[in-house]
Amino acid sequence: MLCVATHRPLKPPPSQKMKTWKFAAKFVWKNNFVKDKAELGSWTRDQLLELGPTFVKLGQIASTRADLYPPEFTKQLESLQDNVPPVAYDVVQDVVNLEYFVEFEPIPFKSASIGQVHRAKLKNGKDVIVKVKRPNIYETMKVDTDNVREIVRFLEKVGVDTGNSSEFVLNESIEYLLGESDYQQEIENAVRFRKNMKDVKWVKVPKVYKDFCTDDTIVMEYVESEKLTELTDPNVNRKKICEALINSYVIQTMDKGFFHADPHPGNLGFSSKGKLVFYDFGLIVDLSEELRDGFKQLFGCIIDKDTKGIVQILVNLGVITVSYTHLTLPTIYSV
């Protein structure tokens, strides 16, 4: 008698959408019941890395939001800022025109969610960095962000508090996130930002070599620095650095109306020449005249300690909303 072996068909690997829903469900549960927030942060970091570049970027943003998450949690996410698994060098070779360079380091010294950075030397002897975009990153992020939209809508519908994830805020965040994959826009942002800050003596913005850039690569001046969170020189005045950073943002927002909106520690440095260095110009916000005027008024009210003025300006700008049914402005002012 002939026996025929039968095998169960292999299950297809779970889709990205299924993985995303599974992560969201587990995170909501763990966030409510896991008391050790460092443990939660470590688990979240590993899950985001597995889910891919879109979620790594969301983790980078979360790592800087000490106003929303406990420090034990955000500390675990900090490695996402510049320590993401890189794509293979053979993929890089297919993207980069190596004929431009006399030297090109195959191992990236920095790998982020949307691209990775290699050191190189141009034929004119200039030391540069080459930022290489991950393959198909826009399409990947588009699918992922559509899944995130669907999950947030579901969670809000069933009564789960999603924080600042209203439809408007979510859509705006996704728009900026997808915009970061546009290297031509980032090149223009970097050129304009450098021009805006050229007279600010304590700020350094690397030069872009546009002739060597493409839709998938950005070639910039190499500027060495230390991360602001890893300064080792005991003689460095950290208070002065903080003041310089604040002053640079006053210039960016109120004077130029064009500011760096992704200032996590992986995108900021302090050079040996005592300058604050800005990197990565994928997320830059161009303020309208109305918003610039609003910021100027807001800073004036903060200096004058005018609480009523601060609240009124924030309401006028749409930063906060007030329900007059439950809470009136005089009630807020009296707090």
Regions found by a protein language model. Give the residues of each.
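Broad phosphate/nucleotide-binding scaffolds in NTP-utilizing and phosphate-metabolizing enzymes
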Residues: M1-V250, G257, G269-E289, D293-L327, ...
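Conserved catalytic-loop position in the HRD/HxD motif
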Residues: D262
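Catalytic-loop Lys-Pro-X-Asn motif of eukaryotic-like protein kinases
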Residues: P265-N267
